[in-house]
């Protein structure tokens, strides 16, 4: 079943063939994320879609929670793991710690990132805090203000 779009500006609808290019074994995904996925078909579609987002953008920005094992909580963490795998500039706003972090030298380092590439990806938790909203607004203001 198709998903209902919440917005109509620049949607990209992926064909079955395009989705398959982002396919990955659930075993590998579970191992990379240090967790187990049960609703495999639903989760597979989400992971396939996230693959295309990260593959099309260069710099990756995520809002979520960095866990002790350096992964990021939830499905959002898949965008983070792919960005690490693809060697992309990667930044996470950790809502719990209320700060931006950049993945550098195999660890999270506090940072104040800017959008500085022609293409970027935004991903994140569906539980966006007021702080998270402010962080996104500030990221755009700092990146694009003259």
Residue spans of the language-model regions?
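Acidic/glycine-enriched connector segments
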Residues: 1-145
């Amino acid at each position: 079943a198709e998903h209902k779009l919440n917005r109509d500006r620049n949607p990209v609808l992926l064909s079955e063939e395009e989705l398959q290019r982002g396919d990955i074994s659930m075993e590998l995904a579970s191992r990379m994320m240090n967790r187990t996925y049960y609703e495999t078909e639903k989760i597979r579609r989400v992971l396939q879609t996230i693959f295309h987002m990260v593959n099309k953008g260069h710099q990756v920005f995520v809002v979520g929670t960095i866990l002790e094992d350096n992964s990021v909580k939830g499905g959002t963490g898949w965008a983070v793991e792919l960005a690490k795998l693809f060697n992309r500039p990667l930044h996470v706003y950790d809502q719990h710690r209320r700060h931006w972090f950049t993945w550098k030298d195999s660890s999270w380092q506090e940072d104040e990132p800017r959008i500085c590439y022609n293409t970027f990806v935004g991903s994140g938790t569906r539980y966006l805090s007021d702080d998270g909203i402010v962080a996104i607004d500030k990221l755009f203001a700092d990146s694009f203000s003259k």
